Amino acid sequence: MISRYTRPAMGAIWELENKFNIWKEIELLACEAQAELGQCGITKEDAKWIRDHANFTVDRVSEIEAVTNHDVIAFLTNMAEYIDADIPEGEEKPSRWVHYGMTSSDLGDTALSYQITQALDIILADVKQLGETCKRRAFEFQDTLCVGRTHGIHAEPMVFGMKFGSWAWALKRAETRLQQAREVAATGAISGAVGTYSSIDPFVEQYVCEKMGLTPDPLSTQVLARDRHAQVMCALAVCASTLESIALQVRLMQESDVIEAEEPFKAGQKGSSAMPHKRNPITAERVCGLARIVKANAQVGLDDVALWFERDISHSGAERVAL
């Protein structure tokens, strides 16, 4: 994402600060679950100490990662620096319980699922609001006549409200698809190496997922299956196509020879450095252009489904860009 096309609320979800805060919470919840379980040696007092002292800084994590070339190890190392800072030399370090029995994928995939739900909640609210606006405008223009066109040629009369009505229904379908994708994506997995729970009790997964508002994966490997992420990206692609269709109609209606409708043009806005009379549909054009990115990223999501055996990381770099 680039700041020009990113709203602050959405951008904040994908900032390292937010990701590491989610990582921290997952690790703290896992410690509390282990203490509740009482099998590995961590006490509730240990878990409380860890929660009270755990912290990180993005700069320090980045500094450590430059050496380790492993983001999770860098994060855990920085957390341990805070957790153990007040422990006298020679005493056992509480940080030894952090990440106990977990893999990097247990942490990263569960956190990514949570980030996806955060992002989809914003998108769903916007799609719902836009659909309701289109519905309201459909009734507002239910008696406004306009020309219906097929193949771009005048066909029969219709009412302008029909356009808004069709958009409202399309957005309702988009909302349904996105909600279904959210439910599929809201899944966590803390199942240890290759997903066998050999190093961690399933109770930890259940505990963490419940606290995070996620559903435990009924059978993961060492990673969450990427068909979940692909469904999200495909739902976003269809939604983007719907928005592109609406924006394209606006662009066509704003043509100088048609001028049936136009997007707002605020005071002080300029349309051209050479032709001051121009009022261009730049917002609609931007929607059409950015829709191409979303649709292309859906292919990335589909390609990420096929991984080697119980995991590889061929999906990781692609997701850092596409998601």
Q: Model-found features: residue ranges?
A:
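A helix-coil-helix interface module used to build multimeric assemblies
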Residues: M1-S191, Y197, P202-Y207, P216, ...
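Amphipathic, well-packed alpha-helical segments that form the structural scaffold of globular domains
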Residues: K135, F139, C209, G213, ...
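Long, amphipathic alpha-helical stalk/connector segments used for oligomerization, subunit docking
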Residues: I293-L323
